[in-house]
Amino acid sequence: MIGSTLSTPIHAIEYEQNSQKLIANPMIRMIAACARNRVMGINGTLPWKIERDWEHFLETTRDGVMIMGRRCYEDFVEHARNRKVIALSRNPNHHFAYAQRADCLSGALEMASSMGKNTWICGGEEIYREAMPLCEELHLTQIDASFEGDAFFPSWEEHFPNEVSRREMNFDGYPLAFLVFKK
C-alpha cells in the first residue's frame, strides 16, 4: 500500500529465494562464551566442555553466516560442513575445507552481506575486538567459574549497555547465564 508505514522492522522481513530463507536487511551479531575472569580460550580451544553451551552456540548460529578466525575455525571444522562459514587468514595460500577465506574482517563482512543472512561474529579475541563496534547484538554465555587461559573476551559493556534477555541454569556443574545485549 503506497504511503503506509511498515510496522515490521525491515531486518525482520524474510523471503524465500532458491528454497533458501533470505533476510532483506541482515544483522551483524556477536556470539561468545566467557568465564568470570573473561577467559574464553586456551591453546586455540575452549577451556571447558559444557555440552549445553555448545548446543546453544550451534542452535543460535544455525541459519546465519559465521565469521571466525583461523584458530577458531580449526576447532570448529567438524561442524562447518553444512553451514556458511567465512574463515579469516592473512595467508593467501590457506584453504579451508568447508569455509570461504577472507583476509580481513571488512572483506568477510562484505562477503557475508551478499548471502542475505544474519552474520555471526564467532571469534577469536582480535576479531571480537575489531567487530564489536559494528555489531547490533551480543549473545554471551557467562560461566560463573574461573579458568586458565590465553584468550580473553574484550570488555563489551560500553558497546552493549542494554541487557534484553537472560536465561540462567546449572549444567555440568557450572552456573551459566545465556545473555543477549543490544546497543
Task: Provide a role label for each language-model segment.
Residues T8-H11, I23:
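Low-complexity, intrinsically disordered segments with a bias for serine/threonine
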Residues A32-V65, R70-K183:
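Flexible, gly/pro- and Lys/Arg-enriched active-site loops
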Residues N18-K21:
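Polybasic, lysine-rich low-complexity intrinsically disordered segments
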Residues P26-M30:
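Extreme N-terminal starter segment of soluble prokaryotic enzymes
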Residues M1-P9:
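Extreme N-terminal basic, low-complexity initiation segments
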